[in-house]
Swiss-Prot record:
This is Phenylalanine--tRNA ligase alpha subunit. Its EC number is 6.1.1.20. The keyword Ubl conjugation does not apply. The keyword S-adenosyl-L-methionine does not apply. One of its GO terms (biological process) is phenylalanyl-tRNA aminoacylation. Keywords: Aminoacyl-tRNA synthetase, ATP-binding, Cytoplasm, Ligase, Magnesium, Metal-binding, Nucleotide-binding, Protein biosynthesis. InterPro entries: aa-tRNA-synth_II (IPR006195), aa-tRNA-synth_II/BPL/LPL (IPR045864), Phe-tRNA-synth_IIc_asu (IPR004529), Phe-tRNA_ligase_II_N (IPR004188), Phe_tRNA_ligase_alpha1_bac (IPR022911), Phenylalanyl-tRNA_Synthase (IPR002319), tRNA-bd_arm (IPR010978). The gene is pheS. It is found in: Cytoplasm. Binds 2 magnesium ions per tetramer. It catalyses: tRNA(Phe) + L-phenylalanine + ATP = L-phenylalanyl-tRNA(Phe) + AMP + diphosphate + H(+). Belongs to the class-II aminoacyl-tRNA synthetase family. Phe-tRNA synthetase alpha subunit type 1 subfamily. Its cofactor is Mg(2+).
Length: 360
């Protein structure tokens, strides 16, 4: 073994044995410093004959590169080990209260607040939360919800379609949260009482519409579910959500493929001022759609419509947030403007409760 090979073996062993960055730096200086062993070898290149420089020079450069790479790798390893050790030693008591600070704290987004409010209301009525995928199959988004072939919602101008897969099937960004109804009926034996908050997607964008928006809908399936039950649930929800003693509701006949009969629901309000006031006035405001679950949807969910019946309703979370809290433009919900969030957002500890008030 040549002297260069022996030096290479020795230096690599010293680098591997360095147990901290201080020791590693000492090895670097002894090898690559001004008077280091590798540096001294490099100085001899000028005194060598061309033949010696061709053979020994290449070996010395290989040695220098090997030592440099080993030093870099070892330094990275030591730094990562130091970080891991510090993380294991550090602890944060997350139960400690936040220190008072003049700095502005973050706010809860109105949509998150609205979801918490609605969840609190329906949880008090015995409902649970159900969720499903944002990327849906044509079957769950349309077919199982009784959308016939040729329905406008199946067209490209209204729905975001993915490219067909190897089987020719096109998945979609769900246009409503209703597919979760069918998934729940397939997986759960009645009685069913669920609400389904989530994101939905349609090709629409203006002051009151967004390509991505939020919906919440509810589903009740039982042997005796009926329109009277549906009306009571919606009345109790509206009174509690808008924090009024009473509401006057109007059910108008409508059409949805997945319900029969179907209704649009208006509630009486006062629209004379900049903010809509519910529980008073002589105006009407449409807030949601509802109806009895269509027998075909029950069948797709694996239930016998001769034994079970159900009712469902749905509304736009963004829209009812705008109505309740006087927000003029839906697009502001997604602009991440700190000034808007400071004005319309909620403090983190202002959790909605039925006892303390939803928007306290």
């Amino acid at each position: 073994m040549s002297d260069i090979d022996q030096l290479n073996t020795s230096l690599l062993a010293e680098i591997a044995a360095a147990d901290d960055e201080t020791a590693l730096e000492a090895v670097r200086v002894s090898a690559l410093g001004k008077k280091g062993s590798v540096s001294e070898l490099l100085k001899t290149l000028g005194a060598m004959t061309p033949e010696e420089r061709q053979s020994k020079g290449a070996a010395i450069n290989v040695l220098k590169n090997a030592v440099t790479e080993a030093l870099t790798a070892r330094k990275t390893t030591l730094r990562q080990a130091a970080i891991d050790a510090r993380l294991q030693a550090e602890t944060v008591d997350v139960s400690l209260p936040v220190r008072s600070s003049p700095a502005e704290r973050g706010r809860i987004h109105p949509i998150s607040q609205i979801v918490d409010e609605i969840t609190a209301i329906f949880a008090d009525m015995g409902f649970s939360i159900a969720e499903g995928p944002d990327i849906e199959t044509d079957y769950y988004n349309f077919t199982a919800l009784n959308f016939p072939e040729g329905h406008p919602a199946r067209e490209m101008h209204d729905t975001f379609f993915f490219n067909p897969d190897e089987n020719g099937e096109r998945k979609v960004l769900r246009t409503h949260t209703s597919p979760v109804q069918v998934r729940t009926m397939e997986a759960q034996t009645p009685p069913i009482r669920i609400i389904i908050p989530g994101k939905t997607y349609r090709q629409d964008s203006d002051a009151t519409h967004s390509p991505m928006f939020h919906q919440v809908e509810g589903l009740v399936v039982d042997k005796k579910a009926n329109v009277a039950n549906l009306r009571w649930v919606l009345e109790e929800f509206c009174k509690t959500f808008f924090e009024v003693d009473s509401v006057t509701m109007r059910f108008r006949p409508s059409f949805f493929p997945f319900t029969e009969p179907s209704f649009e629901v208006d509630i009486q309000c006062d629209r004379s001022g900049p903010i809509v006031k519910f529980g008073e006035g002589t105006d009407w405001m449409e807030i949601l759609g509802c109806g009895m679950v269509h027998p075909n949807v029950l069948r797709y969910g694996g239930l016998d419509p001769d034994e079970y019946q159900g009712f469902a309703w749905g509304m736009g979370l963004d829209r009812i947030a705008m109505l309740k809290y006087g927000m003029p433009d839906l697009r502001d919900f997604f602009n991440a403007d700190v000034r808007w969030m400071t004005h319309y957002g909620f403090r983190p500890l202002d959790m909605p409760t039925l006892f303390g008030g939803l928007s306290a």
